[in-house]
Amino acid sequence: MAMRITTKMMQNTSLNNLNTNKTLQEKLTNQLSTMKKITRPSDDPVIAIRSLKLNSTLNKIDQYYEKNSNDAQSWLELTESAIKTTNAILEDMSGYITQCAQGSLTAEDRAAILQNLSNYQSEIYSTGNATSAGRSIFTGYRTDTSLTFLKDKTERYSITEQRDNSYIDTITHTVVGDMANINAGNFSTASYSAYTEYQVKSYDVARIRLAYNNLDYATDDAVNKNKIKLSYFSDVDTSPVKMNGAYVDGASINTTSYSVFMNQGADANGNMQFTFTPKDGSAPITFALTAGATQTIDANTSVTLDADGVITITENGNPPVTTTLQSTAQTDAAGNTTFAFADRAQSSLEITDFSKTASDDAYASVYGDDNANNITYIAETGELLLGKNVQNKLAALSINDEIRITYDKSEWKTDDLDPVHYFYTERYTDTRKADDPLVYNEEKLTKPKGNVAKQIIEYDIGSNQSIRVNTTADEIYTHNMGRDVGEVYDLLEEYDSLEKAYSTVESLINSGKYEGTELDTLNKQLDALNKGRSLAKSTLQKRCEGLQTIFKGYTNQATLTRTDVGSRESRLELIQNRLSSQQTNFEELVSDNEDADVTELAIQLNSVELTYQAALSSISYVMKTTLLDFI
């Protein structure tokens, strides 16, 4: 059937076609101006959805590659640089220690070495204050706190060191009195004229050297005993609990006079039952304790069970020791009581003497059989001197057992290591109450020797990929570094002062001004100084010979740490290369998906424009034609 086509229909159709052409022209113009295939999701939903996914992935890659990996690289480079500097300092110090070990040092050599050691002693730790974007790089999660104190300060810190018996060493103490200060003005006074070579001697003493020197000291020993404590922890055989003597052998705890058995099943009334068997073969002593009760075994030994289930066996014999076992008592509905024990026991050792300075008397207090049970605290040098019996007791511990020392330090110098990065610490600031200090590293007290997880900082540098960027202070900056250098400095200074005093007395003798009693006094003093300087030189050489190996260990550790950082840098570089490749690939995918082809667009737009112009010409004819033109 034929259809009638009117002029109006022709005009409308022509206008619609022209509008379609114009719409296409607008679309191509927008694509050409924006260089994108679409300007709104409705233009092409497939392209839009794909664009969202590709751009999301690309944004993540940009974050990993341009930000995270660059930050990680900066952190690692700064860490490596600091370790490199530290290693160089350690090698230089090792060289000076080797010189001291050789013994052939002139006065000028000694002065130069003393000056250099003094400089290095402060510099060794200051390199550990390196920062990355304001964050301290060696202090774990405490990136807002420097590794060392940046200025002198006075503030009380209560520090608990958790060590093992490898920290017990033996040092040689030389008794020279005040001979180093002899001069022309005082050699004949009563304080100096009595010096002879027979008063000069040296002997070895065992000690635990603490992390710091110049510790707090009170004139009242009761105050010192309240703040300065020494104890050790050891494994316990808990089924049943056995105690066998005055030391810990790794599996059981011993008292001097008894073997002790504690029945976890308790007596008929649910109380803890104890059996003390004397080691002299006497009849066993069996008894039960209620919570809060104390039983005296003999004049020296007693046992207490407190309300919290803590069992304390105290012995005042040889050497003094208090052994504490933590147990938990539980009573069921039937009234039966059982006890559960911790697998570690704490034994306290009494510190017998306290000295403010490293005097001859302080070292003599632990020397010899008469002082075999003594423990002496020296605040100036930060040492616990051990009598022979105490040394043997602690030496018998397993390497896995913990020796715990608590002490206070209030006077801090620039470049002292901040203890909050190493130990359980209570900090008593001006703004805190005396019974409410700031507490750091509390979790260390719950772990043998304070072995808690390192505070590792990692950066995300890829999908499900991260890299460790930080190195913790304990991996390279140990307290022993500075303490060892300080000891060499002190020994060298003592030797140097005795050499100078010897030269002074020798020049007085050679001056010809003195005769008779004064000359005899000078000759005796010269003999004493000669023996003293020989002993001091021998002690210095012996100590430095041992430190050569120790400092080799320090440099090796620094090298290993630097190698570890370098390996992480190498891994990061590989990841960065991969991220760079991924970034390029995804940028191309995004471009292919979103970006328009300019050449193709130009051709299409030119074609559309020609079509549009032609359409305008034809439509103009249609629009001016009416029905009358056909009549």
Put a short name on every predicted segment.
Residues 94-284, 290, 298, 303, ...:
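Amphipathic alpha-helical coiled-coil/heptad-repeat segments
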Residues 305, 313-315, 319-329, 339:
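Repeat-associated, polar segments at repeat-unit boundaries in modular proteins
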Residues 9, 17-31, 36, 201, ...:
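The ATP-binding site of the protein kinase catalytic domain
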Residues 1-152, 527-631:
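Amphipathic alpha-helical polymerization modules
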Residues 295, 303, 403-405, 467, ...:
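Generic structural signal for buried aliphatic residues
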Residues 289-292, 326-327:
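Solvent-exposed serine/threonine-rich low-complexity stretches and specific carbohydrate-binding patches
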Residues 279, 293-294, 299, 307, ...:
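Signature of Asx- and small-polar-rich beta-strand/turn repeats characteristic
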Residues 18, 25, 29-32, 36, ...:
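Polar, low-complexity export/assembly segments characteristic of proteins
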